[in-house]
């Protein structure tokens, strides 16, 4: 969430920055609430000061042996206490309204993020690789998978429902190989520590990374979600929409040493999304699923290092595509297409031949201090007493299912076989083709 001080001292400037991403900050309501807060705060402080002064008088009278005088003044203390409690309740109510507003406010975009309404206004930064030309009729990954009896959508529908998949044989092995390759690359060459994390998380974790309270409908919950998780209600949990949630929350309520930063973590997990609002989109194939695997990259950095870290993290995701020899493009998301908590985001879009277009396969974001403030994730500089908020970054490195789509379609051959990328062959028992 944003620093509440921005709504107190830079309200108009903050509203103008948020307007770039199409968000209208209710300046009038915030201004009125802030005036109420200041007024009530002054009353609370005056009542506290008066009570302290009277308490001091009582102590002096008691020391002087004037018990009768002390008792008379004590009656005033009782009345002041009631008034003070009432004002504190008023103050809490106003603060709660301000907190509700702050929690609904997205992150401020970086200055270099282009203005825009939607994905059509994103800025292409670069391209890598050239889409192949084929002298035969292309098949999409669904047809290729069904030809090889490796992608079984019908069984998944029977077992669970739409937007799920059963993989078999070499297709299942390819799916596993892709994830293993990504983890090995990121841990052995890019310096990430592999993490195994829970696939179920509590409400505090989802609040920390920004999914709650705004995006609860996009999640799968084991039971109706409570605002606060507790040991007495351990089953009121949610399936993770991304490993970003459990991995980033590892630093919640912690103070790291400056020397330990940056923290670089990676995890391979299934991800679960209800895809609310996407009815009718990408209904065929593996592009948009309720359950899909992803290798996530997370970095925790000092504030001054986070922008360089975003370039590095994005480069790590790009390296996966380059080693797999998959054509892709890198785009800088415009203000209208950014995620709720993002300060700056790059998308990597891989070439999907059957659709004759580029499709998102990775989203890499600098969340600035937006998540850290929610999580109270901090660090302490050497020689300093006061801790500071860290910056958090995350990105897909990559989405496994969409990577598989790209491999199947880009590497198909005229006889229906699929060429296995060289870097994956050792994970496939030395096989060079599927089919």
Swiss-Prot record:
Record flagged with keyword Thylakoid: no
Reactions the enzyme catalyzes: tRNA(Ser) + L-serine + ATP = L-seryl-tRNA(Ser) + AMP + diphosphate + H(+); tRNA(Sec) + L-serine + ATP = L-seryl-tRNA(Sec) + AMP + diphosphate + H(+)
Superkingdom of the organism of origin: Bacteria
Gene3D superfamilies attached to this UniProt entry: Bira Bifunctional Protein, Domain 2, Serine-tRNA synthetase, tRNA binding domain
Protein localization: Cytoplasm
GO MF assignments: ATP binding; serine-tRNA ligase activity
Alphabetized UniProt keyword annotations: Aminoacyl-tRNA synthetase, ATP-binding, Cytoplasm, Ligase, Nucleotide-binding, Protein biosynthesis
Binding site for L-serine: 242-244, 296, 396
EC top class, as a word: ligase
Pathway entry: Aminoacyl-tRNA biosynthesis; selenocysteinyl-tRNA(Sec) biosynthesis; L-seryl-tRNA(Sec) from L-serine and tRNA(Sec): step 1/1
GO terms under cellular component: cytoplasm
Binding site for ATP: 273-275, 360-363
Enzyme Commission identifier(s): 6.1.1.11
One Pfam family here: Seryl_tRNA_N
Gene Ontology biological process: selenocysteine biosynthetic process; seryl-tRNA aminoacylation
HAMAP family reported for this sequence: Ser_tRNA_synth_type1 (MF_00176)
Annotated function: Catalyzes the attachment of serine to tRNA(Ser). Is also able to aminoacylate tRNA(Sec) with serine, to form the misacylated tRNA L-seryl-tRNA(Sec), which will be further converted into selenocysteinyl-tRNA(Sec).
Similarity remark: Belongs to the class-II aminoacyl-tRNA synthetase family. Type-1 seryl-tRNA synthetase subfamily.
UniProt free text on domains: Consists of two distinct domains, a catalytic core and a N-terminal extension that is involved in tRNA binding.
Assembly: Homodimer. The tRNA molecule binds across the dimer.
The protein, known as: Serine--tRNA ligase
Species per Swiss-Prot/TrEMBL record: Vibrio vulnificus (strain CMCP6)
Gene name of the record: serS
